[in-house]
Curated annotation (Swiss-Prot):
Organism of derivation: Measles virus (strain Edmonston)
Region annotation Disordered: where it falls in the sequence: 1-44
Main location: host cell
Record's subcellular location: Host nucleus; Host cytoplasmic vesicle
Family as reported in the entry's similarity comment: Belongs to the morbillivirus protein C family.
Protein's job: Ribonucleocapsid-associated protein that interacts with the phosphoprotein (P), thereby increasing replication accuracy and processivity of the polymerase complex.
Keywords per UniProt: Host cytoplasmic vesicle, Host nucleus
Oligomeric form and interacting partners: Interacts with the phosphoprotein (via C-terminus); this interaction allows C to associate with the ribonucleocapsid.
GO cellular component: host cell cytoplasmic vesicle; host cell nucleus
Protein name: Protein C
Residue spans of biased composition, Polar residues class: 1-15
Pfam families: Paramyxo_NS_C
Length: 186
């Protein structure tokens, strides 16, 4: 069908149903603009699209990290349950007299991570205030949190709150705290 169709209003005018590729008239030697050329955004908008896709990629990476963290927490929970079962009866009776052991603190922290996905410094300070009279329990809590900080992969620590990232890699600090704990309990 040609562009100059028969029309009721006039013979020489083009039909309104005929769609032209662009508002400019085509001239001899000039190539038509393709739909791909027309749909390409200007340079300024192209940068915006990259920012949006980078943000989307970042969100996907965070979601992937959250899934891996949930898997790591489940694995830790299974490991803590196994450790609890392996404790000897002598250690269990000693822990009952003492209160909380390192394993018990780790179990508590892993449960908190599973439920709220956060271990914060304020939670840690509250736990320290509750067990303040017992130097050994305080040392057990610090040791448990340090072990957790080193068991969870480093790239996922930022998703767990502010406690574990601050404890990660502070091995020298833990050795110093353990020496202080031994010297005060002797």
């Amino acid at each position: 069908m040609s562009k100059t169709d028969w029309n009721a209003s006039g013979l020489s005018r083009p039909s309104p149903s005929a769609h032209w590729p662009s508002r400019k008239l085509w001239q001899h030697g000039q190539k038509y603009q393709t739909t791909q050329d027309r749909s390409e955004p200007p340079a300024g908008k192209r940068r915006q699209a990259v920012r949006v896709s980078a943000n989307h990629a970042s969100q996907q990476l965070d979601q992937l990290k959250a899934v891996h963290l949930a898997s790591a927490v489940r694995d830790l929970e299974r490991a803590m349950t196994t450790l609890k079962l392996w404790e000897s009866p002598q250690e269990i009776s000693r822990h009952q007299a003492l209160g909380y052991s390192v394993i018990m603190f780790m179990i508590t922290a892993v449960k908190r991570l599973r439920e709220s996905k956060m271990l914060t410094l304020s939670w840690f300070n509250q736990a320290l205030m509750v067990i303040a009279p017992s130097q050994e329990e305080t040392m057990n809590l610090k040791t448990a949190m340090w072990i957790l900080a080193n068991l969870i992969p480093r790239d996922m620590l930022s998703l767990t709150g502010d406690l574990l990232p601050s404890l990660w890699g502070s091995g020298l600090l833990m050795l110093k705290l353990q020496k202080e704990g031994r010297s005060t309990s002797s």
